[in-house]
Swiss-Prot record:
Record protein name field: Putative pre-16S rRNA nuclease
Principal location class: cytoplasm
PANTHER family in UniProt: POLYNUCLEOTIDYL TRANSFERASE, RIBONUCLEASE H-LIKE SUPERFAMILY PROTEIN
EC number(s) per entry: 3.1.-.-
Organism: Staphylococcus carnosus (strain TM300)
InterPro entries on file: RNaseH-like_sf, YqgF, YqgF/RNaseH-like_dom, YqgF/RNaseH-like_dom_sf
Length: 142
């Protein structure tokens, strides 16, 4: 059993999918999708900090997209920048960077298998990818 919940993030250029663990550390549930604007440096960190406090989380797992050759590309750099910005607001939070290769594709596949419409998929894909990222991390703790 965890002493605090864990938050999972799928950071994109326009949205951040947010997931939260249960206190047992067994399951991840989709929580929210934050609208952001990387170009304007509007990253939704203040709203995320509110969620972290409300959920009483002490750890944030951020998906780190890597290339298949294990190098970190543009999106990976953006996730690392997001981590830095989060730590400016919440310096005491534990941040784990988690290899998220193929998490969005897996989320998309499971939504397709569930016959979710295209418009609905667009609304939930980032939150679902955050669930896949966080669930992978939780499974590694078992």
């Amino acid at each position: 059993m965890l002493t605090h919940k864990i938050i999972g993030l799928d950071v994109g250029s326009k949205t951040v999918g947010v997931a939260v663990s249960d206190l047992m550390g067994w399951t991840a549930q989709g929580l929210d999708t934050l609208r952001i604007n990387e170009e304007e440096n509007e990253l939704g960190i203040t709203k995320l900090a509110e969620i972290i406090k409300k959920e009483d989380a002490d750890t944030v797992v951020i998906g780190l997209p890597k290339n298949m050759n294990n190098s970190i590309g543009f999106r990976g750099e953006a996730s690392l920048k997001y981590k830095e910005e989060l730590l400016k607001i919440l310096p005491d939070i534990n941040v784990v960077m988690w290899d998220e290769r193929l998490s969005t594709m897996a989320a998309e596949r499971s939504l397709l298998e569930a016959d979710v419409s295209r418009s609905k998929r667009k609304k939930v894909i980032d939150k679902m990818a955050a669930v896949f990222i966080l669930q992978g991390y939780l499974d590694s703790l078992q």
